[in-house]
Amino acid sequence: MLEFIKNSLRISGNDFDEEISSLIKAAKEDLRTSGIASTYLSDTNNNLVKNAIMNYCKAEFGFDNPDSEKFRRAYDNLKAKLAIVQNG
């Protein structure tokens, strides 16, 4: 997951690995506390989960990100879809 997120953020070095790993954990925790089952979140092949985490990280990574609100909305939409898909 770390490499997937780093690629989506256009990060090639390891300088930000700790921050990115923390964001990945925070995204998973937010999804879990929003009712998404941990077993669902651990499925590394689930594209909805991967893209939700990616959008969370894009919204939260760095400073002065003019697109952070756009990525936050995308994350919230995917979180809602995950809740529906999981329970459907």
Model-derived regions, located:
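Divalent metal-cofactor coordination and adjacent catalytic microenvironments
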Residues: 1-88
